[in-house]
Amino acid sequence: IKEIYEQKKTHHLVLKILKSLCQRISDYKESQLREASAYDAMLQAATLGITEYIDAMRKANPDLLWAIDKNKRGIFSHAILNRRRDVFRLLNRVNGRKEIIKCRADAFGNNLLHLAAFIGPSSDLDRRSGAALQLQRELQWFK
């Protein structure tokens, strides 16, 4: 029970820090966001599946949704490549720009649908038992 209490306490502190961070970056321009590594943090959060962070930051500063890496892959590209379903579902909350995000190609000419067709990370596949279940999960991502 003490361990759960410590986790909740830590989570509460992290939420306070996130709220403070959101207040601070809400008025930042693109150059300030780059200098603060906010774009990199968004991409890392997408890779790790930290939905709460991405959602709070995008509400504070919608420009953060346009974060891209050196391969011109954005938040939702990273979510798909790492099979982070909850992050990908945030796309439904994006007003008016869904189609632009969905159709945007990376440096290799791949859009979100192409990335969904790639095989997921081996660590993700190893956690599932049986080839049939792995294939089923990959087909669900492609759909």
What are these regions (language model features)?
Residues 1-143:
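Acidic, Ser/Thr- and Pro/Gly-rich low-complexity regulatory segments
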